[in-house]
Amino acid sequence: TVQWNYLSTMSHRNYEDGGTEAVDAKSWSGEAGFYSFENGHMMLWTRLTNPAARPIYNQLGRLKQEVGEARADTIVNQTRNLCLYPNVYVMDQFSTQIRVLRPISVNKTEVSIYCFAPKSESAENRQKRLRQYEDFFNVSGMGTPDDLEEFRGCQQGYEARDMRWNDMSRGAAHWMEGPDNSGFTTCSGEE
């Protein structure tokens, strides 16, 4: 149900009439993953089915020359949500943003969101990035109201007294150690 507003709107969007072209979460491929790092950091990723909607897409050729084919493919064709525990999120998906969560009091948290982009980005790509940001992440966008409701619900749930711990084991049956099919592996710092 999270991001229902976005998914529902996407199914009715008419790009021919000049609507903001967006990453299509409804048809994301089944290829996705979650990485857990030391000290509580983590990253979610998914492979896109429509990477041409991203502002970075027309830079694929240049990126292949600069960073190699595999890394360029990851930059252009995958989304990433990186959580730097405990309070910073670096997100590269529907657009690019940094979210900072700052506790104000025991029952209040400030969420600040910053859109970011490459310094050398063309005016056309910058405009596309900003429209996608406004479309999904802006306060009036399709995703942020749902996210803020999730934050509010979590905050309310943390006030519960009956349960000592928050169960975060969803998907635990699929956890694996070492590299996955993409060849990515976490580093323990011991190597």
How should these model regions be labeled?
Residues 1-191:
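C-terminal catalytic domain of Rieske-type non-heme iron oxygenases
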